[in-house]
Amino acid sequence: MADLSCNVGGIKSPNPFWLASAPPTDKLYNVERAFRAGWGGVVWKTLGIDPPIVNVSSRYGAVHYNGQRMMGFNNVELITDRPLEVNLQEIKQVKKDWPDRAVVVSLMVPCNEKDWKYIINKIVDTGCDGVELNFGCPHGMSERGMGAAVGQVPEYVEMVTRWVKESTDLPCLVKLTPNVTDIRKVAHAAKAGGGDGVALINTVNSIVSVDLDQMAPEPTIDGKGSHGGYCGPAVKPIALHMVTEISKDPETQNLPISAIGGISNWRDAAEFIAMGASGVQVCTAAMHYGFKIVDDMIDGLNNWMDEKGYATLED
């Protein structure tokens, strides 16, 4: 049987399948269910500074294609709407109970040194394995000068990453937005700032459909709608291309990559790993089919690696 253990920028896990920062990783109950199902790691739902934001409902939409609603998934979800201290306590408990699993904390705060160093100092005592800097969210938070508003400016990416690395020895993954002209420039900036790896892609800025009765983008809330983040199987080709661009670029070819975007089965994961990823993150498929899909992912990747004669993911 192949060895599926992985190391993404100094963050180790028993297999390469992590749950991405999203509703499935927003609380202790969900994360414990995920670990019992077999996931190798989680990226905790993005934390910010209190007071918490308010998430609206409904906040999800989908692309209709040949009778299938899940070709693409759209959301206007923001960061966590739970108090910071509650999240910190639960992260500490999860890591205590599951020491062999990767627990990475996603972070997003206003783009100033004081707030970034404040949030880093708050999470270091949780025992988490690393942090993921959310520079990718294209909606809601970007209008507040966070998320993709930072990730679209390489100078900001380098600056904030450096602030974080000056404040902690924890491994730091920089989550990149696909809503840029050249993903390589942003990856260069993440590396220059001291980032230990990159995670990509975050969601694609989108409007998936329009409610022709209310004349507003879907999903609508009280008759109003907005652009959101597009994910799911439809974005996989975009993600594969951007992962490949970074892994083959001479300046970043050895930079660890946590690949995200439309990964629904072991074959998708194998494709990203073949193109240079050290591990993968899953969200939409887990929301659609449930946490136990990781069983087939682990078995499928194991069987394929055995068949091809690969002993480790590095092979």
Describe the function of each predicted region.
Residues 1-104, 108-113, 117, 297, ...:
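N-terminal capping/small domains of soluble enzymes
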Residues 18-20, 103-106, 172-176, 258-259, ...:
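Short catalytic-loop micro-motif centered on adjacent basic/acidic residues
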Residues 22-23, 261-263:
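Active-site metal-binding loops of divalent metal-dependent hydrolases
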Residues 32-37, 41, 110-258, 267-277:
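Alpha/beta enzyme core
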Residues 45-47, 135, 202, 284-285:
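Short secondary-structure boundary segments
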Residues 52-69, 209-227, 285-310:
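C-terminal helical cap(s) of enzyme catalytic domains, especially alpha/beta-barrels
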Residues 259-262, 281-289:
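Helical hairpin unit composed of two closely spaced alpha helices linked by a short loop
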Residues 311-315:
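Mid-to-C-terminal alpha-helical segments outside catalytic/metal-binding sites
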